[in-house]
């Protein structure tokens, strides 16, 4: 395990240096190419519910045009929200136990909602913590699971619906979303590096691997033996050309590391599990 972690750490350091030298113009050009390919995928057209990472201003494919297109097509768009989990959440005790930080996929209400997001210290558009309780969770309910002993009134960590404005209620009626949660059809993922076998190296926190595992086991983790988890969404990663390792080089992975179903590269390449 120590050797694996060391190999990952060294590869991350190498890629971070490479990406720091990629120009803004190159990122813009590659983002345009990758976006065009993604928007042409049958899986994208068929997806009613998708999650999209919100991109940093440099070093990765921009997802702004993807979010805009998804809303123009009437899709339901979910984005990552990271929070400190504290005590094990009641609804996902087994799933989140042992992790100090957890990623949920919460809904954007509209394009205007997306455009109103403020950037965090990394320049990533981020959901306002004060709005979390009103946002649908792709696993069901609203917001994030309530920690043991907390109340919806005293914490932003809530799966209880907070009173909405009239305009928000009208919007949700139009979307006709299932309160019970039905997972996602498509997940658009970032990464630090990829190889031609569709292995992915993240930034070291395991957020996406952990989330996909929770998604697949949702229901079982809540103690409902009649549930077998949700259908696995189609996993699509976006990468700058500099993030794809040369042929013959491989991402070091552990058993829990989840490969993607498709990798779209900013130079126009698309790698799939069936190719």
Give the label of every model feature segment.
Residues 1-6, 10, 17-21, 125-199, ...:
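Surface-exposed, charge/polar-rich loops and edge strands
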């Amino acid at each position: 395990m120590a050797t694996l972690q060391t190999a990952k750490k060294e590869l991350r350091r190498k890629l971070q240096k490479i990406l720091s030298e990629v120009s803004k113009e190159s990122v813009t050009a590659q983002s345009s190419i990758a976006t065009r390919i993604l928007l042409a995928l049958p899986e994208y057209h068929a997806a009613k519910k998708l999650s999209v990472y919100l991109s940093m201003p440099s070093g990765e494919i921009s997802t702004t045009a993807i979010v805009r297109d998804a809303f123009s097509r009437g899709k339901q768009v979910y984005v990552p929200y990271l929070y400190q989990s504290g005590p094990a959440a009641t609804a996902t005790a087994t799933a989140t136990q042992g992790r100090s930080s957890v990623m949920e996929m919460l809904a954007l209400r509209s394009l205007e909602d997306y455009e109103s997001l403020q950037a965090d210290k990394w320049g990533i558009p981020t959901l306002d913590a004060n709005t979390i309780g009103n946002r649908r969770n792709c696993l069901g309910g609203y917001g994030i699971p309530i920690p043991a002993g907390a109340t919806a009134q005293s914490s932003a960590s809530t799966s209880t619906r907070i009173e909405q404005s009239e305009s928000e209620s009208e919007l949700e009626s139009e979307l006709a979303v299932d309160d019970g949660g039905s997972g996602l059809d498509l997940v658009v993922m970032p990464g630090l590096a990829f190889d031609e076998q569709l292995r992915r190296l993240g930034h070291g926190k395991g957020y996406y691997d952990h989330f996909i595992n929770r998604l697949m086991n949702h229901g079982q983790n809540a103690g409902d033996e009649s549930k077998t988890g949700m259908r696995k969404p189609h996993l699509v990663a976006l990468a700058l050309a500099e993030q794809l390792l040369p042929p013959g080089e491989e991402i070091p992975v552990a058993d829990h590391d989840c490969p993607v179903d498709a990798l779209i590269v900013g130079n126009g390449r698309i790698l799939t599990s069936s190719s």
